[in-house]
Amino acid sequence: QPWVATIFDPANFDGFQRMAAAVERHDTRMIGQIWHVGRQQLWNPIIAPVGVSALPDAYSWSVPHVMTASDIAMIVEAFVTSAETLKRAGFSGVELHGGHGYLISQFMSPWSNIRDDEYGGDVAGRTRFVREIIAGIRAVCGPNFIVGLKMPGDERVKGGIVPAEAVARLRTIALQKVDLDRA
């Protein structure tokens, strides 16, 4: 998308570095937001979106390719690599965008995640994806690199995340030492 500055494009690295230096020069911290839209990918006749389960996106009605274990590992690694690149650019941390039906929230939601493997089922299973991302970022970027999480507190759909589940989910995720949360 031409209006989004992507950290995975090496051509953008210098711009991210200049931005971080300009902000941090004023004794403030620069936090980059990273995300994957999952099944919300804009429709493309050649490339199917990937998703947690074979459930259509509520807006495009496209049915995603269900992610395999190797797809999941590859995307976890992409999140970790993006965080590491932002750290090298001078950012103080990242916020994982798990709101608005993006991939992280697709994993966490009982409405969109009907998997019967280790990434589905109960709260522990549905938070496994984001917990693996956080653990990977901590391992690569260290304990002082800020890791935040934006996630839904109430999806307002039948069978979706409700406030009580959001609290249980946050307790499970907090064991990974998330520095900030925005619901």
Language-model features: where?
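Flavin-dependent oxidoreductase catalytic cores
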Residues: 1-183
